[in-house]
Amino acid sequence: FLLSLPHLASGLASLVLSK
């Protein structure tokens, strides 16, 4: 789970920035 946090965080940031 902890290892997936960076990936999820970068994914969410990408979605937010794309808007």
UniProtKB/Swiss-Prot annotation:
This protein's record includes keyword Secreted: yes
Protein keywords: Amidation, Amphibian defense peptide, Secreted
Compartmental location: Secreted
One biological process term in Gene Ontology: defense response
Endpoints of the signal sequence: none
Tissues and organs where the protein is expressed, per its UniProt entry: Expressed by the parotoid glands.
Main location per the UniProt record: secreted
Residues the record lists as Lysine amide modifications: 19
Gene Ontology CC annotation, any one: extracellular region
Protein name: Phylloseptin Bu-2
Origin species: Phyllomedusa burmeisteri (Brazilian common walking leaf frog)
